[in-house]
Amino acid sequence: MAAQKQAARKTRRRDRKSIPVGQAHIKSTFNNTIISITDPSGAVVSWASGGDVGFKGSRKSTPYAAGMAAESAARKAMEHGVKKVDVFVKGPGSGRETAIRSLQSAGLEVGSITDVTPQAFNGVRPPKRRRV
């Protein structure tokens, strides 16, 4: 009985298609940096973040963690055949430039770099200023 149940749960493995050109979306916040590498249509090929590569707490927000995450995402993307990426950077965090440099050093060719940080036209009230 148990053997039949296990055989019924087999899932189909996705076939890997070669994607020569992709997009790298870097979301850099004050607490973490998330890198997603997608194909031109926007389907995610690989991703990594500061927490994904083993950093916890305030260490996730460091430029070093962003670099390690970018390297990890680039390695996974290169297994899918990605060779060149157009970079889209969003957010005010400290890991922006380091992540782009790490993508280049991992072996990906960076085509263009675009800042897509959303700008509020007098939207919500910003958080109060810190008193340290």
Curated annotation (Swiss-Prot):
Give the InterPro entries listed for this entry.
Answer: Ribosomal_uS11, Ribosomal_uS11_bac-type, Ribosomal_uS11_CS, Ribosomal_uS11_sf
Q: Name the Pfam families for this protein.
A: Ribosomal_S11
Q: Which organism is it from?
A: Bifidobacterium animalis subsp. lactis (strain AD011)
GO molecular function annotation: rRNA binding; structural constituent of ribosome
One GO BP: translation
Q: Organism classification, top ranks?
A: Bacteria, Bacillati, Actinomycetota, Actinomycetes, Bifidobacteriales
Q: Which family does it belong to?
A: Belongs to the universal ribosomal protein uS11 family.
Q: Which PROSITE patterns match?
A: RIBOSOMAL_S11
* The protein, known as: Small ribosomal subunit protein uS11
